[in-house]
Design a protein with these regions (language model features):
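A surface-exposed beta-strand-loop module
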Residues: 20, 84-147, 209, 526-529
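Extended, low-hydrophobicity, Ser/Thr/Pro/Gly-biased non-transmembrane segments
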Residues: 24, 28-30, 40, 127-236, ...
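Beta-strand-rich binding/interaction modules
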Residues: 88-94, 462-463, 478, 482-539
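Amphipathic alpha-helical substructures
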Residues: 282, 405-487
Length: 548
C-alpha cells in the first residue's frame, strides 16, 4: 500500500516526463528531419518572426501567416519549414513570387527562386490553415487546448514542448536557432483577450473581433511562443530587481481575480530567490507575466502559464513528502525558474533537456533555501529522490528529437545538490550558477558546454561525475568498513575514474564531539584513522554499504 500511495503521489511528474520523452527506441526519417540540423536549415540564420493569425474557437480553426526574416549564411535554394499535420502549409511567397513547396510529412521544403547571397538579409512569408492537433493531456501531450470556463466562455491555450511549436504554427522547428525578436498578431472573437509573449504593443478593434499585437525584443525558443485566449482581467505590480523596475503582469479569469491577488504573491518571492541565486531576470525588456490556462502550466517565455488551481504544492500535494513542498505553489516556482534555465539558457538538442529540467527542479530547492533556510532546502531536495527510477540515462539520443529519462527532474536536481556539497563553498557555488546565466546569456547550449563550464569554475575534472549521473543508471556506492580505528573505503558501482570526494560525520563518543571529515575515495581501497562512529552525509546522492 505504501508503494501504491507513493506512485499515486508521484504520478503527475512521472507522467510529465513520459509524455515529453516517451519510450521510443526506433526512429524514422521524420524524426531525423525534425531532430537534426539538416542542410535545408543550416544555410540560413533566423532573425525575426511575425506570426499573424486568426483563431476561431468555435471551429477549432487557425489560419494566417508567418513572415520569416533571415540572414543567408551559405548559398542554397531549398528551405525547410516545419508544420505538423493536420495543418496545411498552403503558400510560400518571396519578393511577390509564389514558390513551389515539396511536402514531406511534417517537413516542407520551399524552392527559392531568388539567388541567396551569403550575408544578405531576406524575408519569406508562409501561409497556413487548418484544425491543429487538440491537446490530449496538456502540457505533456500538447497542442491546442480548446476549453470553456465556468461562465461558458472560450478558454484556449497552446502547449507544445517536445511535440514542437510546428504543431500549431509554421517555423524552423529546431532548438539550435532562435529569432532575435518576434511579433505576434492574434485575432480572436470579440469579448475575448489574447495574451502572448512580451509586451502588448497594439490592439485593433473590429466589429466582431479584436487583434492583439504582442512583441518580444529578446531571442525566444519556438516552444516558448504561446497564445492564451479567454475572458481575462489583468492586474500588475512592479518588482524592484537587480536591473531596475520589472513589470509583473497577471492575467486571470475574471471570477478568479481576488483569489489571484492573494495567491500570486509567490511570484515576487520567486523573483527574489532566483535573482539572488541565478542573477537578473533575463527578460526585463519583455516584462514578466503569469497567465491562467486550462492546463497545469508551462514555461512560455515572459508569458508563464498557470493552472495549479490556486493551491500550494503540486495541485495540493507535496512532491518531496517533507512538508516544505506545501509552503509554495509548485507551478509558479518551477515554471518561473525556467526563465533562467530553458528560456535564457536553452538546449540545442532535446537530448540535453536536463539543462532545462534538472536545473529548474533544483531551483525549487534554492527557493526553499532562500526563504526557509539551508536545512529545509536539503530536506526538500532529498525528499524528491523517491521519484527517481534509474531505469534509463538522463541524456537521450541526439538528432532525432528525443529526450532522455524523466529522471532529469529529480535526479538532475540531486546531482546539482551533490555538486554543491563537492564545491564545499556556497559563495563559489552561487557564483557558478550566476555565471552560467551571464556567460550563456540568451544562448543555445549543449550539455558538454555546461559540464565543461562547471568543471572549469570548480577547478576539477568532473567528466566522470557527469558521466556517472547523466549517462549511467547506477547510483555510486560507497563501500566502507571500520577496522582497528581506521575507516577503509572505496567507490563501487561507478564509471571508470569516478573519484568524487564525500563528507562523513565522525562522532567521538568519549569526548562527545562531532565533526565533518572529507574523504577522497577511488575504486581502490583507501584508509584513514578515525576515532568514533561514522555517518555518511546524506546530502550526497549515493548509496553506502558497510561491508563488515
Amino acid at each position: 500500500m505504501k508503494k501504491l500511495l507513493l506512485f499515486l503521489l508521484l504520478f503527475p511528474i512521472l507522467s510529465m516526463s513520459q509524455g515529453i520523452m516517451g519510450d521510443k527506441t526506433e526512429f524514422s526519417r521524420q524524426d531525423t528531419l525534425r531532430g537534426s540540423i539538416t542542410k535545408e536549415r543550416s544555410w540560413w540564420d533566423l532573425n525575426r518572426y511575425h506570426l499573424d493569425i486568426k483563431v476561431n474557437p468555435d471551429e477549432k480553426f487557425i489560419s494566417g501567416s508567418n513572415k520569416i526574416s533571415y540572414t543567408v549564411l551559405d548559398s542554397y535554394n531549398l528551405m525547410q519549414i516545419d508544420l505538423q499535420n493536420p495543418l496545411n502549409l498552403t503558400k510560400a511567397v518571396q519578393d511577390n513570387s509564389e514558390l513551389e513547396i515539396i511536402h514531406d510529412g511534417n517537413a516542407h521544403f520551399i524552392k527559392l527562386i531568388k539567388d541567396q547571397k551569403p550575408g544578405s538579409k531576406e524575408e519569406i512569408i508562409v501561409y497556413y490553415e487548418g484544425n491543429p492537433r487538440t491537446a490530449v493531456r496538456a502540457p505533456w501531450d500538447g497542442g491546442i487546448s480548446w476549453e470553456k470556463d465556468e461562465n461558458g466562455n472560450h478558454f484556449v491555450a497552446s502547449s507544445c514542448q517536445g511535440l514542437g511549436a510546428s504543431v500549431w504554427w509554421p517555423n524552423k522547428d529546431h532548438m539550435y536557432d532562435e529569432p532575435e525578436s518576434m511579433l505576434m498578431s492574434v485575432n480572436v472573437p470579440k469579448g475575448l483577450t489574447n495574451v502572448s509573449n512580451g509586451r502588448l504593443v497594439g490592439v485593433d478593434e473590429m466589429s466582431d473581433s479584436t487583434t492583439f499585437h504582442w512583441e518580444v525584443v529578446n531571442p525566444i525558443n519556438n516552444y516558448g511562443v504561446n497564445i492564451n485566449i479567454g475572458d481575462y482581467v489583468n492586474f500588475s505590480e512592479i518588482y524592484k530587481g537587480e536591473k531596475g523596475d520589472l513589470d509583473m503582469d497577471y492575467y486571470v479569469l475574471s471570477y478568479n481575480l481576488e483569489k489571484a491577488k492573494v495567491h500570486f504573491k509567490d511570484a515576487i518571492k520567486t523573483m527574489q530567490a532566483f535573482e539572488h541565486w541565478f542573477g537578473p531576470y533575463p527578460f526585463y525588456e519583455d516584462s514578466f507575466k503569469l497567465v491562467e490556462t486550462p492546463y497545469l502550466g508551462m514555461e512560455h517565455q515572459s508569458s508563464v502559464t498557470y493552472g495549479n488551481k490556486y493551491r500550494k504544492g503540486y495541485l495540493g500535494r507535496d512532491l518531496s513528502g517533507t512538508g516544505w513542498g506545501l509552503k509554495f505553489d509548485y507551478i509558479i516556482i518551477h515554471e518561473t525558474g525556467h526563465e533562467w534555465f530553458a528560456n535564457n539558457i536553452t538546449y540545442k538538442d532535446i537530448a540535453d533537456m536536463w539543462v532545462h529540467e534538472g536545473f529548474t527542479t533544483y531551483s525549487e530547492n534554492l527557493f526553499v533555501d532562500y526563504h526557509y533556510g539551508k536545512k529545509a532546502a536539503s530536506e526538500y531536495v532529498i525528499g524528491t529522490r523517491r521519484g527517481i527510477r534509474n531505469e534509463k540515462p538522463i541524456i537521450g539520443p541526439y538528432n532525432v528529437n528525443k529526450g532522455g529519462s524523466g529522471d532529469m527532474y529529480s535526479k538532475g536536481a540531486n546531482l546539482l545538490h551533490t555538486l554543491r556539497q563537492v564545491a564545499n563553498n556556497d559563495i563559489k557555488w552561487r557564483n557558478i550558477l550566476r555565471g552560467l546565466n551571464k556567460d550563456f546569456y540568451h544562448k543555445t547550449v549543449t550539455t558538454q558546454e555546461i559540464e565543461n563550464y562547471i568543471s572549469k569554475k570548480m577547478k576539477m575534472n568532473l567528466k566522470p561525475f557527469f558521466d556517472q549521473y547523466l549517462r549511467d543508471i547506477r547510483i555510486p556506492e560507497l563501500e566502507y568498513k571500520l577496522v582497528d580505528g581506521k575507516i577503509h573505503y572505496r567507490w563501487n558501482n561507478v564509471v571508470n575514474d569516478f573519484n568524487m570526494p564525500i563528507d562523513i560525520i565522525v562522532t567521538d563518543h568519549v569526548l562527545g564531539l562531532q565533526n565533518k571529515l572529507r574523504i577522497y575515495p577511488t575504486q581502490k581501497w583507501k584508509s584513514k584513522k578515525i576515532r568514533g562512529s561514522i555517518e555518511i552525509d546524506n546530502n550526497y546522492y549515493i548509496d553506502s554499504k558497510n561491508v563488515i
